[in-house]
Design a protein with these regions (language model features):
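N-terminal, charged low-complexity regulatory/assembly segments
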Residues: 1-219
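Short capping segments at the starts of secondary-structure elements
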Residues: 280-283, 289-295
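A short acidic, leucine-rich amphipathic alpha-helix
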Residues: 285, 298-304
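Residues within helix-turn-helix
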Residues: 296-297, 308, 315
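Helix-turn-helix DNA-binding motif, specifically the short coil turn and the N-cap/start of the second
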Residues: 292, 306-309
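C-terminal regulatory or interaction extensions
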Residues: 186-270
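Beta-hairpin "wing" of winged helix-turn-helix
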Residues: 320-329
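Conserved segment of winged-helix/HTH DNA-binding domains
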Residues: 334-355
């Protein structure tokens, strides 16, 4: 596999790796591409000069990053034109990992992580009028903000972690998601229990942010849109000793929307279901609504959230039919909401076909 690694200057605990990848629109795959594949590939007519051009592009990006003092804002204007010229993606992975030759205090690590995230979201934070992002609930609200570009949401999600709040929400994921889709969770349940136990043992942030490398196994090339990928893969990478979080840049917004469109065609409505179920607040709402019909203000009171926040999440769940609305018998003009058992059965059926 053709790779290029470089340390990020004065950020010794962060490493960067650029991997040449191919997005195969016909088969909806993203996979690493080697020089030999390009030269001798049989499924597509890969040209050697095309690969060399991409390799030069990759090295130029690395060089630009170094020259800019690791200011990544130039990527928006730099990546897009080349993505349109050929079907390759340059994926830049930023690793937060331990440096065995350097002793770093917890405060230094926290500051390093905070500065790294701030470099990426500073403009977004100012435009959004938000002073700071703290805790997993605030993170959810940020990710739901339609003004934030898709690639920025991916990056914020991948680089942000608050251990105390995250652990609490992991338990919420586990206790709520499992009953909702219990028939399809037996494998995920066992795996997740192991990861959660390992995560609870961690006492040093430097162990939490360990080196994590993306593997492109030749037998696992298809990007399967499954519950384990969308709901638990992110948690797994953040909760397992020996792994860390990563961020990728290169798939621009329009390309991401195209990928989602293809995935929806290929997998029916499963992607939309899983995106809705991958939010902790919505899972907690479903847990409450499984017991009885509830109004917005009742749900807000139970979850200790504001009514506008609940209304936002309800609109998403209503759109894909996971919950249904009916008029209240006790209060004129007010809707009550409940879980659609039939739609949950549909989701379980779709999941079972992916095994």
């Amino acid at each position: 596999m053709d790779k290029f690694k470089v340390n990020l200057g004065k950020k010794p605990d962060f490493k960067m790796e650029a991997i040449i990848c191919l997005y195969d629109r016909k088969w909806n795959q993203v996979r690493a591409v080697t020089r030999s594949e390009v030269k001798y590939g049989k499924s597509r007519e890969f040209l050697e000069n095309e690969f060399s051009r991409l390799a030069l592009y990759r090295d130029t990006v690395i060089d630009e990053i170094e020259k800019s003092g690791f200011d990544f804002s130039f990527l928006d204007r730099f990546v897009q034109p080349d993505v349109e010229k050929f079907p390759y993606l340059l994926r830049l992975y930023f690793f937060s990992g331990k440096n065995p030759d350097k002793v770093v205090s917890d405060e230094e690590v926290d500051a390093l992580i905070g500065d790294f995230v701030a470099d990426w979201i500073n403009e977004t934070v100012e435009a959004d009028g938000t002073e700071k992002i703290t805790g997993i609930e605030e993170l959810y609200r940020t990710l739901d903000n339609p003004l934030i570009a898709a690639e920025d949401r991916m990056l914020i999600l991948d680089t942000f972690a608050n251990r105390k709040r995250l652990l609490s929400d992991l338990r919420a994921y586990f206790s709520i998601a499992v009953p909702v889709l219990e028939n399809n969770f037996h494998i995920i349940r066992a795996e997740f229990e192991v990861y959660l136990r390992e995560y609870e043992k961690i006492t040093d942030w430097r162990d939490f942010y360990d080196y994590y490398s993306i593997r492109f196994d030749k037998d696992v090339q298809q990007l399967d849109v499954t519950l384990s990928v969308l709901l638990f893969n992110k948690i797994r990478s953040m909760t397992t000793v020996g792994r860390g979080d990563y961020s990728s840049v290169g798939m621009r917004y329009n390309e991401l929307k195209e990928w989602e469109r293809i995935a929806l065609v290929s997998n029916g409505v499963l992607l939309e279901y899983m995106k809705a179920l991958s939010d902790g607040t919505r899972l907690r709402m479903l847990s409450e609504l499984r017991q009885r019909k509830m109004r917005v203000k009742d749900i807000a009171r139970e979850l200790k959230l504001t009514a506008p926040t609940i209304s936002h999440h309800i609109s998403i769940l209503l759109r894909i039919g996971i919950i249904t609305a009916s008029m209240s018998h006790s209060e004129s003009g007010v809707c009550e909401y409940s879980v659609s058992a039939d739609r949950i059965d549909d989701i379980c059926e779709l999941l079972s076909k992916l095994k």
